[in-house]
């Protein structure tokens, strides 16, 4: 699935990946566990019903990038306890993915994680996938000074901290809105989408933007996509 005249990967030397629902498939519903814990946390923190907490959670997620950011801005919440509680989930649905590890290894250059989650959660996911040795570093929500994607400041902090040249980088994401700023900075952008009927697990707004001008490439097969990139780069010498 390609748009007309997408940016290529010929110049890419840094490969930047989102974590959840990008490195592992959405149908594992790992984020569903986090989602439920966020809802429960909001209900307890604000002393409201689970239904009201759910509506507030989704509203804040869409408006602020994360529910946490909304709680901080609207209610003055301190994030430390929240971050610890909502990421206490069962990572066992994730199985080792040697094909993903091999595909990442073939890509020439650095590989970095840019996530709105915590480093602890990212480490757990990467170890379950058996790809933790493929990544140089994780830039998490704490490194972002608690300001989530798609905030432009978060990308600026990430690029500065890791010395990434955006015009020589590619960004892989499962949310199109999180690719708009990277594209504007000069990065080649890839939207990773669920395959087949599993797309129904997504919220409608999350599925928007597949045809947006800031999305260079769309794939529902990350491993195959990376293998094709690596093969093309190898053939080009």
Regions found by a protein language model. Name each.
Residues 1-12, 105, 112, 118-119, ...:
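Asp-based, Mg2+/Mn2+-dependent phosphohydrolase catalytic module
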Residues 29, 58-59, 94, 113, ...:
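Residue-level marker of alpha-helix boundaries and capping positions
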Residues 2-17, 22-101, 120:
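N-terminal helical cap/lid subdomain that shapes the substrate entry/recognition surface
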